Amino acid sequence: MKRNPVVAGMFYPADYHELLEMIEYCYLSPRGPKELPSKRGNYTKPLGIVSPHAGYIYSGPVAAHGYKKISENVSGEVTAIILGPNHTGLGSGISTMKGIWKTPFGDMEIDNEFADKLWKECDVLDLDENSHLREHSIEVQLPFLKHLEELNIAKFKFVPICMMMQDYETSMDVGYFIAKVAKEMNRKIIIIASTDFSHYEPQESASKKDALVIKDILELNDEEIFTDVVTHNISMCGYGPVIAMVKAMKDLGATNSNLLYYSTSGDVTKDYSEVVGYASILVK
């Protein structure tokens, strides 16, 4: 099927030229990497990132840090595994799908071969379009990837994985099979875990809670990510996708992680009484 965007015109511009201007702003913003991706990288091994999924005016500059790193580490044809939480409650517990997703920059093809093999091997994963039709957490990552295509940095296909179930064991299973299938298919892959961090808390408490989980991610400690989210009641919407990404990346040989940037919505609105946390984190 062809999936139409559901948050174009809301989370990011629906017009090609306005979207291009917005993404360039995200890179050049004081909260962004302050430079545009300028040259094709050289793919040597899988790369993982944590990337936010709010409206671009709030989290786009933070996300740009991760996509700048992607641009420096990819070349040729690359499959992006994009894991996002299910905010809508529609569809199955964990799902992928096949087909094409439309974006203002043009169509984005799913790596149907990878998606098909993954859902057949991973018992917790379903092939289900309904989970994806209204969900924004994966969609908002695609314009950044298509922009890198516009710059001739790489050619991307992707595999969407929407996670309503985010318990520790299930998330670890998803990560295990992503790595297994990537090895079996000898794919060049990147893995994007789409999440925001604390939601609608004062800046001080949000940043303290977020620092706990960020520390766990930097230590590649998938079990502590889950433990801290539960123990400290951290309202991070995509902890399951992050756990799955960390598990997959470790199975693929990752040994280190770096915090690229952390910010909150308060840094944009200047209202620090209720903020949402955003982080860009590199795993390789």
From Swiss-Prot:
State which residue ranges cross the membrane. none
InterPro entries for the chain: MEMO1_fam (IPR002737)
Q: One Pfam family this chain carries? A: Memo
Give the matching HAMAP family: MEMO1 (MF_00055)
Q: Which family does it belong to?
A: Belongs to the MEMO1 family.
Q: Which NCBIfam families does this entry report, sorted A to Z?
A: AmmeMemoSam_B, PRK00782.1
This protein is called MEMO1 family protein MmarC7_0632
Organism, per UniProt? Methanococcus maripaludis (strain C7 / ATCC BAA-1331)
